[in-house]
Structure formats: structure tokens, C-alpha cells
Amino acid sequence: MTDNQEIKPKKLTLGNSKLLLNKSFDSLTGAQSFVNAKSKTLVEVRKSSIGSTTTISLNKERNSLDQSVIDSNKEEFNRRLSILKKAAEQSKLHDPAQISTLSKLASINQSINSKNEQSITDKAVEQKHQNIEDNKVEIAAKIVQDNENISSQIPKKKKETLAKSVLVGMRTRYGIEEEPALEKTVDNKVVVPKIKLEESKKFKKADLFNMLSDDENGSGRTRSLASIKRAREKEKRKLVSQVPEKVYREVTIPEVIGVGDLANAMSERVADVIKELMKLGILANASQTIDADTAELVATNLGHTVTRVQESDVENILINDDKVEDLRTRAPVVTVMGHVDHGKTSLLDALKSTDIAAGELGGITQHIGAYRVTLADSKAITFIDTPGHEAFSEMRSRGAKVTDIVIIVVAADDGIKTQTVEAINHAKAAGVPIIVAINKIDKPDIDIERIKNELYVHEIIGEEAGGDVIFIPISALKKINLDKLEEAILLISEMQDLKASPFGLASGVVIESKIEKGRGTLTTILVQRGTLRNGDIIIAGTSYGKVKKMINDKGREILEATPSVPVEIQGLNEVPFAGDQFNVVQNEKQAKDIAEYRIRLAKEKKISVASRSSLEELLLKASGNSKIKELPLIIKCDVQGSIEAISGSLLKLPSDEIKLRILHSGVGPITESDVSLAHVSSAIVVGFNVRAWANALTAAEKTKVDIRYYSIIYNLIDDVKAIMSGMLEPIVREQYIGSVEIRQIFNITKIGKIAGSYVTKGIIKKGAGVRLLRDNVVIHAGKLKTLKRFKDEVKEVREGYECGIAFENYEDIREGDTVEVFELVQEQRQL
């Protein structure tokens, strides 16, 4: 298109009236469908293709016009725009007369101002025509072609609907206040239907559904919201009525599982699981547990596949393998054993230069302690001190299990004793090297060779005699030969090549545990592998928790502990048992799972033992021997190890007639609840190194509960043994008191036969037991009914005197018979 080419006018339809505007662009350039108003203000008309809206706005051309020209024609433009609005308003009323008048008025106005209008238009075109001429034809052709392609593929109804949406978008975009019905035809490609929107009528959801409707039948009927709602409800009912296909799952079943947990694992209703259990004859609710076999039957009946898992697998995480390259030399762990007062504690005092013996009672170590001694050459030795009384055999056994070397202390002036033999047996069972320290060599009149000979009897043979046991004479008091003892320990440890990995999660053994007011649970542990750090989560037996603080044997707080280092830790939820293995785990959940598993195992074991005891009691009752007495006890101690030792020793007391029952045992002072339990069960409360609280003492006085305090264990055991002995039935024994020879028989009226007798030995008493012998054969055993001296009744007749006797309910007596007289004596039994 050239500059001289004439531009044909374009019709713009307003209602039923047509108003001819000058200077529209050629229809072939549909991309620039716009109308120049009087003052060159551009009125944009959107040229839309169905499904693809293309709008080319020439506002830039408008903005680039001479601002002075626009201002001069502003008033004229407003007048023309007002006429257009009136025309649109009249088109709604469908008044042909008014529409015709407006049309004529517009034509007259057009002719009057044509010259000015033409000059303004020519100037605008002249300024911008050169810039857009090159692209105009190409853009317009492409748009028209796209419109034709898309229009041919879309139904007429849908075209009109989308055209409506386009028109609404135009109004919204350009802020047209009054909405006249417009009809615009561009090359007969797109027809915009007439739309009448009253100002008072609001836009509703139904209008949106109507515009977006895919109805191709051309019905044109608007669907109501109620109809749409009914259709949605129908779809919902259809979905609900469809039964979902059941999903069969693979269920992992542990050794014990709750009914509710099983239902969740299978995604089944709890009621269905309970029904299956009822079919198997089991009545259970959702909170109860069932065994793995029953759970497998239920899951199989419901169509699921089952995978059995051992609950003990939770402890597999505690298994750690050390790499050879990670191993490092560690300090030896030495256990000191021996008899009471043979000098074990004094030896430790001398080795670690501290005095702990002064606090002991009876020369006996009251609980296990662990100490680390650093030698002059920076080498270290860890010592574990076990008590010397046989009551602590179990504690010494645990000490032997964690030790590398055992030192058996023997007093040179006392020799081999019971605890010495016991310590030897523990060391042999542990399979560890033995060093015999012959103590107190500073005393006069000692015989070391005699000690060695006594040890030979127990297969403890020294190196000089071809054995593998080292004998070292020492004096703990005078500190004689202590350096030789240390050298022997280091020599054996080098031969053993003791190594452990300081890397990875720590593990070890519990040496001792207790509860201290203000500090909570205190646990002494020995690290055997890895490195224990503050903040680690550990599991020890059924106890677990986070390590809050670590204190070494010197009383200093430390941040980590390596192998062979004993430390006291805080943070466990309860008191573990001495000898329990401890392990560091990743998180508290793992520790809790392991603890719960171990608690269940302990309960099952306890139930099994209780069932066995009940069966034994039932058998005793069936046999008629139901005279079993019971001694209930409540034991409170300062440390957990003492509880185990006391309980173990008491339960070993032999008695088939007295059953010792420990109702409760714990660490800490005696409380009011302990007294209440003792009152209702008639138990004795025993406190070892602890005392009762004030309210507990008051309650004990009111309820007459027996509370006994002890600080030495063997005194406690002896007292309990005496109490049990007093509960035993006494032994009834015959005690011989004399013999009588029958010399003459007398028949007395109303009395019967009286035997004239002579007391040959001892003394006879009225009411005593008698045995009648004829030719040295016992023919009667009974009771002496009558004893007379001449005509007088007497209580007793001594040797060398004559008397008359008669038996109770027996008269077959003859001259020459011999009578043995005895008394029944009760003797108190001892355990």
C-alpha cells in the first residue's frame, strides 16, 4: 500500500443505526482495526480470531502525535464521543426516528469538519506511515490467515461464545462505563453478537458458565446453578457406590504385636481383625497384644502375605566390627580380689596414693570401685576393686569378666581362706592371668613357702615351679615391692597385646550404679571400645538416656572417655545393674526400642518362673506338705550392686520350709510407700547404708513395721538367717532318762495291773514316754500313766528305789520285762 492509495471508509455499527466515521484502515490490514476520532484520539477495536486473540494497539502512534494538535481538538473529540454514547443509548430503545436523526446529525457534522479531520489524519499518517509500512502487510496477512484457519475448525456457537468473552475482556481492560451493544464486521470473518447489559444487572456465575459452555447443539439455554449442583451430587453418589478394589499387602509381623497395630499394618478395620480372632476362639480388643503365630493366621485369612521378623533383630545395631588398622594399645584392666582384711584396699591406696580405707567398716569394701593409676613412664593401669566377702561372689564374677589380669591378695600371716579360694575359682573361670600378691611381709613370723604350698593344692603354681603364676611378696603398708607388682602387670599386658579401637560408637560395662539426691542416677562404667562423649545416647540393660556429665576417678569433669577409662556418668532414666553391657546408639528411639524389648523378655522370664513356682506349690499341697512359711522382705540399698549381692546371698539360704520373698528392692532411702507395702504384707524393711525419711519413721511407728539398718552385709545376712531359723518347726527328740525292771505283778480292783518295779538306772517321771521290752524286743511304746511310791502318787522316782507303775491303755506286762523311760525334747533348728 502506497502513500497515495485511497483508504476506503469502514462501517462501525452502533445498535441498529450506522454512523459513518472517516479514515478507517483497510480491511486487508486487519491487525490495525482502529478508528480515528476527531482529535486523532485513537479508539481501539479488537480484531479477534476464535481461540486466539490478537490485538495490535496503535497507542504508540497516538502518543507520538503532536501534543499541540491533540490539545486543540480535545473539545471536538469530547463532543463527538458524547454523540456516539447518545447513539448507543438510543439504540437500546430501538427508536428508528431518533436513530435516523442522530445519523443525519453525524453526517452533517462529518461534512462540516471533513477538511480539518483530513488534515489531522494526513499529518499522523505522514509521521508514522514510513515506520510501519514494511511490516503492516505481512502482519495483517498472517493474522487474517490464522483467523481463517482457526475459524474453519471451530463451530459457530463456540465462536460467538468466545467472542462474547473477548468483548467483556475489552470492556474490563479499557474501563468502558456504559456498555452499548456493538457489532463489528472485519472482512466478514468474525461476527460479534449483540449483547445487552444493563447497568443495574450484575455479572453472575451463570453468565460465566454460559460463555464457557461447550454446548455444540446450539440450544443456547443457560444452565442453572441448581442443575450444576444436582449433577455434581449425582457424580459423588456414583463414586461412593463404587466399591474400591481391596489392596493386599505384605505385612511384617514381630514376635508380639498389638491388635490395633496389626490392623493398621494391613490397612484393615480393627473390627474385621477382631472378628477373625473370634473365629480362632480369641477374645481381644484393639489395645491387647497377640503372638506372631496368631497374627500370621489373621493376616493370611484376610488375604495378606506375611513376613516374620525376630524382635531380637533390634539389637543387631549394637554389633560393631573394628578394623585392624583402627586398633590402638590400651591400658590393662586389673581386678583385685582376696579375703576380708587381707589388704586389698590398702594395696589400692598405696598404688593410687589415696586413702579410702578409713571410710570402710569391718575392713570390707562396700561396693565396686574403678580407679586409673598413671605410672612414672606415663603408662596407665585401671584397677577394679571387688569386695572380699562371699556375699559378693556375683559382683566379683562380673569383675573377672571385664578384667585382663587378676591380682589375688593373700595375707602372709593368715594364709588361704574361703574368699581366697572363691577368688581363685573366678579367675580360672574367666581364663585370665593371675598374679598372687603375698601381703603383710613386714610382719614377724611369716612363712611365704607355706602360702605357696597351700596355693599348690588349688592348682596355683608359681613360675619357679614350672607354672604360669607370678608370686610377688609385698607390703602395702610399707610400700615394699610395689614397683615389682606394677612391672609384672605391664609385662603381662604386653604379652597379651591388649588393643581396642578408639573410633566409632562406644561400648563397655557397668561397674556400679546408685541414686544420689540432687544428682539423680549415677553410673560408673568402664569404656571397652570406641570413645564415649558428652551428649551420647546409651543403652545399658533396660536403662537408657543421654550422657549429661562425665566425671573421672579424680573427680574432674571430662568431655570424652577412651578405652580402659572408668568414668561416672549422669543421665540414665533408671539404675542399671552392675555388669550390664552398655552401648551408644544413634538416637533415643533406638535406645527405647531395645529397652522395651529387653523389658518384655524379662517379664516373660519372670512369668515363666512364677508359673513354675506355682506348680511346685500345687504339688506340695497335693502331697499334703503345705506347711510352707514365708518371710517377706523389702530391701533398700545405697548402690545397685549391693542389692544384687544381698538378694543373691539371701536366696541361697537353704530351707524347704521357709520361702524368702523379696517384695521390693531399690536404691535410695526408705520411703513411706515402702512402709505401707511392708504393713499390708507383714514384711521386714531392711536398709543397707541408707536411712528412712521422717514421714516413713512416723508411719512405721503407727503401723508397727520392723525397720532394720545395716552397714556390714554379713551382719544383715546373719540376722535374716536367724529370723528364718526361728520360723522353722522345732525338732522333737527322745531323751533317755532311765530304766526300770519289773519284778512283780499286782491286780488291784478298779485300777487294773500294777507292776512292782525297781529303778535300775537314771530316773523315771510320771507322764514320760516308755518302751516295754521283752527279750530285748520292743512290744509296746506308750505313756506312763501311774507312778506310786507305796500308796502315794509321786512325780518321779530315782535310781535304787522301788515303785509301782502302770501303762496307759496297756496291761500285757510280765515279770522280767524291762522298761525304758524317755522324755520328748524340742530343739530349735538352724539353717
Swiss-Prot record:
Residues 439-442 are annotated as: G4. Keywords: Cytoplasm, GTP-binding, Initiation factor, Nucleotide-binding, Protein biosynthesis. GTP binds at residues 338-345, 385-389, 439-442. One of the essential components for the initiation of protein synthesis. Protects formylmethionyl-tRNA from spontaneous hydrolysis and promotes its binding to the 30S ribosomal subunits. Also involved in the hydrolysis of GTP during the formation of the 70S ribosomal complex. GO terms for cellular component: cytoplasm. Residues 329-499 form the tr-type G domain. Residues 338-345 are annotated as: G1. Residues 385-388 are annotated as: G3. It comes from the Bacteria. Pfam families: EF-G_D2, GTP_EFTU, GTP_EFTU_D2, IF-2, IF2_N. This is Translation initiation factor IF-2. Residues 475-477 are annotated as: G5. Residues 363-367 are annotated as: G2. GO terms for molecular function: GTP binding; GTPase activity; guanosine tetraphosphate binding; translation initiation factor activity. InterPro entries: EF-G-like_DII, EFTu-like_2, IF2_II, IF2_N, P-loop_NTPase, Small_GTP-bd, T_Tr_GTP-bd_dom, TF_IF2_bacterial-like. It comes from Rickettsia prowazekii (strain Madrid E). Belongs to the TRAFAC class translation factor GTPase superfamily. Classic translation factor GTPase family. IF-2 subfamily. It is found in: Cytoplasm.
